[in-house]
Amino acid sequence: MNLFDNENLKWRRFVGDDSFDYPIDYEASLLSIRDDGHVDLLYRWAPNCYCHFHRHTAETTSTVLEGELHVETIDPDTGETLDTNIRKAGDYAHKEPGDVHMERGGPEGALVLFNLRAIDNSLAESLSRDGTIIGESKFDEILSRRRAGN
């Protein structure tokens, strides 16, 4: 499968509204999901835009394919940024569950391959600025949508 030029990929776009104080504009495409809890996703960010503030609840690996991915690690207790890492094309990372962070595309956006392994059905939790859970990505819901053809 060509991840760079593939008109058959189905993209789901996410944009923020006035309730967020940072620009949200990114898309996700489900590449693969297996009964053993593994999920492969391709994400792309618009230039200088974020995805939702979140915590991974699954074991996660990622590889930047194009552009830059700016990752801000956040202290969940204080909300302060602990560090910022700029990942460039070719950069690979592996994280255990629990990592709280913000991600945004660089000046030209970003294209990133994510490989997750669900633990207890959960993949990630979207968070408000104060750390309150405002949404959750669940393995069984994604699997059901895939089987239904959505």
Each model region followed by its residue ranges:
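A short, N-terminal "cap"/entry segment at the start of jelly-roll beta-barrel domains
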Residues: 1-37, 81-85, 127-150
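Short, charged/polar surface micro-motifs in flexible loops or helix N-caps
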Residues: 36-38, 47-49, 68-70, 99, ...
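Short glycine/proline-enriched turns and hinge-like loops at secondary-structure junctions
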Residues: 55-57, 105-108
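Short acidic-glycine-tyrosine-enriched beta hairpin
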Residues: 35, 75-106
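Conserved hydrophobic/aromatic beta-strand scaffold that supports enzyme active sites
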Residues: 28-30, 40-44, 61, 84, ...
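A short hydrophobic beta-strand segment most commonly corresponding to one strand
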Residues: 94, 107-125
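Conserved short histidine dyad/triad with adjacent acidic residue
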Residues: 39-56, 77, 87, 96-98
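Glycine- and acidic-residue-biased ligand/ion/polar-headgroup-sensing regions
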Residues: 56-78
